[in-house]
Amino acid sequence: MLYSNFKSLNKKISKVGLGCVTFGREITEDKSIRLLDVAVENGINLFNTSYYYSDGISEKILGKFFKIKKNRKDITIVSKIHGDLSKKTIEKCIHESLIRMKTDHIDYYGVTHDPNINLDEILEIMDRFQKEGKIIRVACNNYDISMLKSSKRIQEKNNFSKFGLLETVYNVLYRGAEKELINYCDLENIDIISYSPLGAGFITGKYR
């Protein structure tokens, strides 16, 4: 396995991460646990999940895996929420994610865009959780360059925690991140992970 140095955590992270969106949905709990085992045996140390994946079952499966294997400290967890990003919802989701995954912290916790909530309110509550140590770094999902810059202005003005990670779509068919995002994030020490690197299977020739 090849590894990259994630500046935002100062950790070596496997270049291949394991997405857990199908856990508890297309893949049973037992098969998910076996898949996690194989991933770790092959050097993968990044698991990417979400509060909403399989109505929370994905995070619960990770929690069961960590309890069985006693290897939480060896794994970097990425989780996230979308939709309603009110203070009440963010607090509820982060607390439940911690309980589900049987951990006292989540390495990266991401937010998307909620047009109904002021961005400064979202960044303020995420900053609180980072400073409390319940999340190690604040992350964002599908932010474009203008949203990243707007966030930076708010974060610097209020001394809020800055983003440590951007999760965005990037593969050989969708290469928009190459225009500005990659360079900007490199300058701002924001690490990047891509989702749908195989285009949900279309790039592999699965669908004809």
PLM-predicted stretches and their roles:
Residues 11-16, 43-46, 71-75, 103-107, ...:
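Short, well-ordered coil/turn segments that N-cap beta-strands
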Residues 19, 50-53, 109-112, 141, ...:
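Conserved residues at the C-terminal ends of beta-strands
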